[in-house]
Amino acid sequence: MSMLCYTLITAFLIGIWAAPKSEDNVPLGSPATSDLSDTSCAQTHEGLKTSRNTDQRHPAPQKAEDQELRTAANIIVDPKLFQKRQFQSPRVLFSTQPPLLSRDEESVEFLDNEDSLNRNIRAKREDHPVHNLGEHSVCDSVSAWVTKTTATDIKGNTVTVMENVNLDNKVYKQYFFETKCKNPNPVPSGCRGIDSSHWNSYCTETDTFIKALTMEGNQASWRFIRIDTACVCVITKKTGN
């Protein structure tokens, strides 16, 4: 009798140990597995949504230069700032449309038009004209209106130039009239017309400082910046001559 009871108790215990102890042992398709899958998917979706929201709240860091340039384009300029403008240069123009050179491309005029902030200026600059008398320039140059985002100021520091100016709900672009060399060596020996047997020569740009509208902190301010204004010939005497 005792042996029979011992056998029944042992069989009962083996049956209990063989029973599933967690949802991990539940067959696929059972309610426990479905709930677990749904919970896991919900947690994954919630995690992705949280990560996406976190990225929106904390965007990737941007370069300081890019942020400053974007700020410069959105700043609204007080018209009184132009009344305080001094040392006005004909090489700086604020306009809503790209300025054009004259037809012969040898001079430039600032016309009185309502799309320009330089209405009181009318200037003309020569671009090394070649006359019909057999005259030639020592160096060949080219002039054009350009825009700038950075420049070197009179102290040698790199500053941010305002490319776009928002004035009275109208966006003006700041243009600069620059002159550059077409080629440092217009002829194989260097500058044109230089005696290469006694002199070394080459063409290079020279610059000048003009007043331009720049960014200083979060405010617009006038500052002297450097631009190229001419192409000249540099000569050095050859040694042994």
From Swiss-Prot:
Segments carrying the region annotation (Disordered) are 47-67
Q: What is its main location?
A: secreted
Q: Which domain of life is it from?
A: Eukaryota
Its tissue distribution reads: Expressed by the venom gland.
Q: What keywords would UniProt list here? A: Cleavage on pair of basic residues, Disulfide bond, Growth factor, Lipid-binding, Metalloenzyme inhibitor, Metalloprotease inhibitor, Protease inhibitor, Secreted, Signal, Toxin
Kindly state the subunit structure of this protein.
Homodimer; non-covalently linked.
UniProt-listed PROSITE patterns: NGF_1, NGF_2
Q: Main role?
A: Nerve growth factor is important for the development and maintenance of the sympathetic and sensory nervous systems. It stimulates division and differentiation of sympathetic and embryonic sensory neurons as well as basal forebrain cholinergic neurons in the brain. Its relevance in the snake venom is not clear. However, it has been shown to inhibit metalloproteinase-dependent proteolysis of platelet glycoprotein Ib alpha, suggesting a metalloproteinase inhibition to prevent metalloprotease autodigestion and/or protection against prey proteases.
InterPro entries annotated for this entry?
Cystine-knot_cytokine, Nerve_growth_factor-like, Nerve_growth_factor-rel, Nerve_growth_factor_bsu, Nerve_growth_factor_CS, Venom_nerve_growth_factor
Q: Where in the cell is it found?
A: Secreted
Family the UniProt entry places it in: Belongs to the NGF-beta family.
**Protein name as catalogued:** Venom nerve growth factor 2
- A biological process from GO: nerve development
Signal peptide positions are 1-18
Taxonomy, top ranks, is: Eukaryota, Metazoa, Chordata, Craniata, Vertebrata
